[in-house]
Amino acid sequence: MKTPKNDVYTVSRLNGEVRQLLEGQLGRIWLNAEISNFAAPGSGHWYLTLKDNFSQIRCAMFKGRNQAVTFRPANGQQVLVKGNISVYEPRGDYQLLIESMLPAGDGLLAQQYEALKMKLAAEGLFASDTKRPLPANIQKIGVVTSPTGAAIRDILHVLARRDSSIEVIIYPTPVQGSDAAKSICDAINLANSRAEVDVLLVTRGGGSLEDLWSFNDEGLAHTIYNSGIPVVSAVGHEVDMTISDYVADLRAPTPSAGAELLSKDADNKAQKLLSQLSRLKQAWQHYQLKKQSQVQTIEHRLQKQDPQRRLQMYEQSFDEMQLRLQQAMQTKLHAYALKQQNLSSRLANQSPQHRLTLEAQRLSYLSAKLNDAMDDKLKMSEQRLAHRAQQLDTVSPLATLSRGYSITLTGSGKVVQAPSDTCVGDTLTTRLRDGSVTSTVVEVS
């Protein structure tokens, strides 16, 4: 049988082409699974297995990615991960390189939220050029919210404090539950049909991601976008960002902040600046969404020729060798521990008490000898110090002054040694034993 020359693969070439094929065909995927065999070596990378009832896959999450994870993964935990299928070429194992990880419950909602946000951004619902300016002189505000919630009380309190002349019309609707999104849409449509207010404030107080989920509805997004009345979205707290915040003409971080935006105040310039900043933020967020999509496309193209991928492969290999070394060291230490126990048992049968007594006596003798030597050394040092101090005192200028002499200095601090060192009019300082005398030169001879 002839051996083919052109179609013979090496193992490295085969694994490399399999990796490129998997990465090119599947790309980035989401996976919902249970964690097992979780390991976090000193390199900072994470290695784990994701499994369900029938299958499992090895995974790696490198340090630059896992630093963004807000919880500590544990075996048995259900998670939602996003990553890329790849092949660890040295072993020929295919694995998932994880980019992000969320707890399964919050993760599914977050995935739906991100998918809808990308879709609506692509449709242009977040574009800054579609945002309508708020009326310059607002007389009536329509509030779409629950009539019994804390949000409406905060809004009415702020409006009463800032501008009691503004009329408020409440379009009551539930803001939480399976039917809440449709009810909010109906309230917005009702306000548009009546055309009785200058602006709509769609709002509710804070809550969990599930509590705010009605404001992440696609139908509600289109209703806000198609509203003939400008819409301000003020949902939850400042850290909460819902789809309604992105599509509204203006976003306020809280219900109270929404009321402040829509009411007059002596500091009108600050209100305008806040509005401009909010629009700038929305434009920046829209720009980020657009660029994020472009970056993801470029990342996918670069994955096949990413030098960091090869570095990560070597790091993964190093981590595996490190784990094996740790296991070998633990086995060796256990063997040494058993040997030490055996030696200790044998030593206990041959008491070294006599030798310890001799060594204790020797130690006491050496300690006393060391103390004597230290005392002798200290006395010699004190004598040398006293001798040096006497020598310094002999040549010290201060000793000369104490014997009745004086030293005259020029204004620059130079010692006057001859008449030529001074000029008429110079100020001189004469140092005496108990002080100094300042004088002026009137004649030099």
UniProtKB/Swiss-Prot annotation:
Chief localization: cytoplasm
GO BP field: DNA catabolic process
Top-level EC class as recorded in UniProt: hydrolase
Gene Ontology MF term list: exodeoxyribonuclease VII activity; nucleic acid binding
Catalytic activity: Exonucleolytic cleavage in either 5'- to 3'- or 3'- to 5'-direction to yield nucleoside 5'-phosphates
Enzyme Commission code: 3.1.11.6
Keywords: Cytoplasm, Exonuclease, Hydrolase, Nuclease
InterPro entries cross-referenced by the UniProt entry: Exonuc_VII_L (IPR003753), Exonuc_VII_lsu_C (IPR020579), OB-fold_nuc-bd_dom (IPR025824)
Annotated Gene Ontology cellular component terms: cytoplasm; exodeoxyribonuclease VII complex
Subcellular location: Cytoplasm
Self-association and partners: Heterooligomer composed of large and small subunits.
NCBIfam families: xseA (TIGR00237)
Biological role stated in the UniProt entry: Bidirectionally degrades single-stranded DNA into large acid-insoluble oligonucleotides, which are then degraded further into small acid-soluble oligonucleotides.
Protein family: Belongs to the XseA family.
Name assigned to this protein: Exodeoxyribonuclease 7 large subunit
Source organism of this protein record: Shewanella pealeana (strain ATCC 700345 / ANG-SQ1)
